[in-house]
A protein has these predicted regions:
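A short, polar/proline- and glycine-enriched secondary-structure boundary/capping micro-motif
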Residues: 68-73
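A detector for short, charged/polar N-terminal pre-domain segments
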Residues: 1-4
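Core-facing hydrophobic residues within beta-strands of well-ordered domains
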Residues: 6-9, 93
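Vicinal oxygen chelate
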Residues: 19-20, 41, 75-119
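Short aromatic/hydrophobic contact patches that present stacked aromatics
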Residues: 11-13, 48, 95-97
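Core segments of cupin and vicinal oxygen chelate
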Residues: 15-66
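Short alpha-helical segments used as structural interaction elements across diverse proteins
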Residues: 7-8, 53, 106
């Protein structure tokens, strides 16, 4: 497989230091609609804002996130699972999610693993 059929950006997830101020800025100042939000029990919170055209901007707030950390943020395992090591710092990008056909996700994962990407 050489080509991934990516149909745009689904969402971008960033890490913030203050969720209340972040929500206030994106809703009250920029006028974005808060589409969903939920608690990550014992870890923090996750919220999404509508950017239009099917794209969203997501923010994590982690209760133990460092103020800053060099490199790319990552969560080896699923956030909130109690396993893995969250290394997302305030002001970092946690992940970028693309719109892809859900039927093809397993094949795409297999293809990137074969290219040496750790998942």
């Amino acid at each position: 497989m050489n080509k991934f059929e990516i149909n745009g950006v689904h969402h971008l997830a960033l890490v913030c230091k203050d969720m209340e101020r972040t929500v206030e800025f994106y809703t009250d100042v920029l006028g974005m609609r808060l589409t969903k939000g939920f608690d990550l029990e014992g870890y923090g919170q996750h919220f999404f804002f509508d950017m239009g055209n099917g794209s969203e901007l997501g923010f994590f707030w982690f209760n133990d996130a460092p103020l800053s950390q060099p490199g790319v943020a990552s969560a080896k395992n699923i956030v909130g699972s109690g396993s893995g090591n969250i290394t997302s710092a305030h002001g970092s990008m946690n992940h970028l999610a693309f719109n892809v056909d859900p039927v093809k996700i397993a094949n795409y994962r297999e293809a990137i693993v074969k290219k040496g990407v750790q998942c």
